Amino acid sequence: MNDMTPPVPRRSVSEIEALFALPFADLMYQAQGVHRAHFDPNRIQLSTLLSIKTGGCSEDCGYCPQSVHYDAGVESQGLLDLGDVLKAARAAKDAGASRFCMGAAWRGPKQRELEPVLAMVREVKALGLETCATLGMLKDGQAEQLKEAGLDYYNHNLDTAPEFYGEIITTRDYQDRLDTLERVRRADLHVCCGGIVGMGESRTQRAGLIAQLAALDPQPESVPINLLVRVEGTPLAETEALEPLEFVRTIAVTRLCMPKSFVRLSAGRQQMSDAVQALCFLAGANSIFYGEKLLTTGNPEWERDQRLFDSLGVTAL
């Protein structure tokens, strides 16, 4: 793997659309070549995600069953006890995960809410795991507190292209997201930032999301690509499913535009066949969320993932 390469060119939306339009075999060939230039193609990074505070969120994200605006059958749950978080973190480490992400359904944490999360970060870090948190928007100084506690990564997704964003969320604007990402960078935290596809956006808008992500400077260290999980009770429950090969194309284009980032298969993996996941790995995905639940939606069981890894000859980082 050779990192002595020129800076990554910033591509326009039309240039990214042209990548999407390549013949499938050509796109996969290019993406796999770029992937091999920067990563071992047979190693996958494993992260586990735990909801440390569930439901009751004031935001109106149209895909999210945790919003107070929708009746999606999610029971609100207060912040977990430290002991419960550590129990889950130990189980994740024993199962092979190298990173543990803690997610809270907040618009953003108040200082009194942040304090117990800082303790969670310190204790999970002491287990020898990389730490990640997704807590919503951060105020000035909060990213620095998380960094001091031992946080490695902060997740804050752009979700979709600016042109489609207002169709999905009205309680938080695009600049709010960019401002939080800037605070995270200033605190010298690694950035985990991606989006969701299959929400009814056009291919042009998928290209627009990737263009926005790739334009972040520096580019995110981790890029989670979520496939919409259509949850009954949310506004997007009846959205037409994205074609599997279009999702694979999205992974390949993401790899070409962000060659040094870890590209993670995130939500929606439970509904993918092993063959589709294998194509995603071939296209440059090299990270997954590992464990039977992602916040409030399902995820493949550990045993299924291990069987898939064995059949593909890949191992965990």
Swiss-Prot record:
EC id: 2.8.1.6
Record keywords: 2Fe-2S, 4Fe-4S, Biotin biosynthesis, Iron, Iron-sulfur, Metal-binding, S-adenosyl-L-methionine, Transferase
Protein's pathway: Cofactor biosynthesis; biotin biosynthesis; biotin from 7,8-diaminononanoate: step 2/2
Classification via PROSITE patterns: RADICAL_SAM
Cofactor(s) needed: [4Fe-4S] cluster; [2Fe-2S] cluster
GO MF assignments: 2 iron, 2 sulfur cluster binding; 4 iron, 4 sulfur cluster binding; biotin synthase activity; iron ion binding
Pfam families (UniProt xref): BATS, Radical_SAM
Cofactor mode of binding and number, as noted: Binds 1 [4Fe-4S] cluster. The cluster is coordinated with 3 cysteines and an exchangeable S-adenosyl-L-methionine. Binds 1 [2Fe-2S] cluster. The cluster is coordinated with 3 cysteines and 1 arginine.
Superkingdom of the organism of origin: Bacteria
GO biological process, one term: biotin biosynthetic process
Radical SAM core domain residues: 42-260
Binding-site positions, [4Fe-4S] cluster: 57, 61, 64
PANTHER family xrefs: BIOTIN SYNTHASE, BIOTIN SYNTHASE, MITOCHONDRIAL
Similarity comment: family membership: Belongs to the radical SAM superfamily. Biotin synthase family.
Subunit structure: Homodimer.
Protein name: Biotin synthase
